[in-house]
């Protein structure tokens, strides 16, 4: 790279509009959309689509709700010409859809293009020619007047040919290609000459499409260019002002949005931003940006994964996992703080209320996407993500302090493996840490009774280091009685329970925070169809975790438990 790039590159020209109005405007309705996936998108593919893939994508575009679809450059190849004829002759074009065909301003190409759409109910012929200084000088060696004459002569020929076919509802579109790099006064001169040649007026509108053929400036400069043209165009009331942003600088979406604020009525682009070089503006992102602002986009992406699968198949190009709204990871949070906020947002979000879940600008369900991948756990994650997955997939609602305790084990596992932990991975770890802790004590069965004072009496069949034993105790409820039976210095510090499922076969989960002797507190967990059994299993789990960890009370607890087992055996 150059130390001083100004010796090789010059900044884009700016537009002097002291009273520009677009910065104070908002977009309150959807523009007219035109998909150029089958033309601009197709010509940019390493392997252009065959007719079957083109037809599949055409049908997907119709299903989404697009009413203007650029289907081909018919004069470029017999394949493109035949595809247009197939759509017309097999009556595959819905009555409310207009197909668009592109041509350069050469007589033979124009005649071939118009012939390709003979018999169509509705069609737009789209003419373009480059007008910027570099193209005039380097590519065509032509003057401004010569370039304007090319556009006007092509327009007149298209008018004559289409006027001779009144059975078709014709629309004319003109693009001064390289508009974003051209002088504004010349762009206006050519555009006005073209609209005059077409005789744009009441009942005879035309589309003027202003492209960023090569994106060369910040989006605000393009917005200024659009507002400048919007204010000065002759016959503006009979012109649909369209934009066709490319993404060379990565700001095509912003350029399109600001252009709409500046007076544009229509946007051309491709699904997921396919197109030459870095692509055309992404119609999906534009539409869903409107949707998240409460503006109906008039396009249907309620099954966005199906749309993506179709586009990936037809284009033979993958959609990036970070692509807005549709990528595999765009609704995924690995960060602990993000996960915690999302989890709390889901818990508070009410049906039919304004969407306010942190970090999620749109409800994935609106796009037909599930919540399964919203929170995923790796070494960067915290307790919130782990807790959310256990809740959603396995029905375990861990109390907050248990979340903190278990998150340490999760962190150790993900640090060790360097891999993402799935919901099943987390459940397996939880089972190993809590549910399957059966040494040195293992619960087998129990019987409950009440004595004359109303206290609970319990008899528990257990194993101690693999040896059967029976312990008995009394207390104020089953847990208190069980602790009495264990004859250990155990205190229950906290207790939580919940049903994991509904119905006759429902299971209960219990979480017990215990302290053995003067050791730190720790949790145990148990699951069973019986709530009492689940709570007893949780106590055993908590005690075993303390004993296996070698806390201060271990020696005393082991000695006492051994004595009890010997007495009762």
From Swiss-Prot:
Positions of region (Regulatory domain): 437-569
InterPro entries: 2-isopropylmalate_synth_dimer, AIPM/Hcit_synth_CS, Aldolase_TIM, IPM_Synthase, LeuA-like_post-cat, LeuA_allosteric_dom_sf, LeuA_N_DRE-TIM, PYR_CT
Domain Pyruvate carboxyltransferase: 31-305
Entry-linked SMART domains: LeuA_dimer (SM00917)
GO molecular function: 2-isopropylmalate synthase activity; acetyl-CoA C-acetyltransferase activity; magnesium ion binding
CDD domains, A to Z: DRE_TIM_LeuA (cd07942)
Pathway the protein takes part in: Amino-acid biosynthesis; L-leucine biosynthesis; L-leucine from 3-methyl-2-oxobutanoate: step 1/4
Predominant location: cytoplasm
Reported cofactor(s): Mg(2+)
Entry superkingdom: Bacteria
EC primary class: transferase
Summary of the function given for this chain in its UniProt record: Catalyzes the condensation of the acetyl group of acetyl-CoA with 3-methyl-2-oxobutanoate (2-ketoisovalerate) to form 3-carboxy-3-hydroxy-4-methylpentanoate (2-isopropylmalate).
Similarity field: Belongs to the alpha-IPM synthase/homocitrate synthase family. LeuA type 2 subfamily.
Oligomer and partners: Homodimer.
Protein's UniProt name: 2-isopropylmalate synthase
